[in-house]
Amino acid sequence: ARSADTLAATLGFNPYGDARYTDDAGNTTYTETGYVLSISAAGELTLRSDDGQVTRFRAVSGEESDLVECARSLLSTITSGSAADARLYLTELQKDGAETVCIFDYFLNGIPVYPAGGHGAEIRFSGASVVQARLLLRAYTLTTQTVSVLPPAQAAAILPEGSELG
């Protein structure tokens, strides 16, 4: 997993400036002109505009295809270098006037992964500008290890009579 400072630098924030602080819970926040970046100790990244006139994270236009590409590119930048097998895919697009939300979910070998806390990522646009982004920083990997759904004693208790645990 990449450090909060590395993620901040990847997004163009100065991780060594005076506008960086970490609270007692381990949440790190970076503030720079137009945006606030927060990375929680639990692995949730939030990027939000602190004014309405931002251009730093912006799509080419307000067209849906450009917004989706901007959101995908932003998420790709944040997750680059991850060795995880799961990937984020667009699963929903919500439009309400000038506001558009691109919703992404993690998929592992074509199977959706729904972490506690909602969708894998949500990128909110006002016009063509990103006004808020939320990403659950997760790394799902495939394994060949067999995992029991139930402990053996419980599994045996629900087996039909005459059956054996395999």
Language-model features, listed with the residues they occupy:
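Single conserved position on a long alpha-helix in the C-terminal lobe of the eukaryotic protein kinase
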Residues: 119-121
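Preferential activation on post-signal-peptide N-terminal prodomains/segments
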Residues: 1-77
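Segments that shape or occlude catalytic/ligand-binding pockets
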Residues: 53-60, 66-115, 127, 131-166
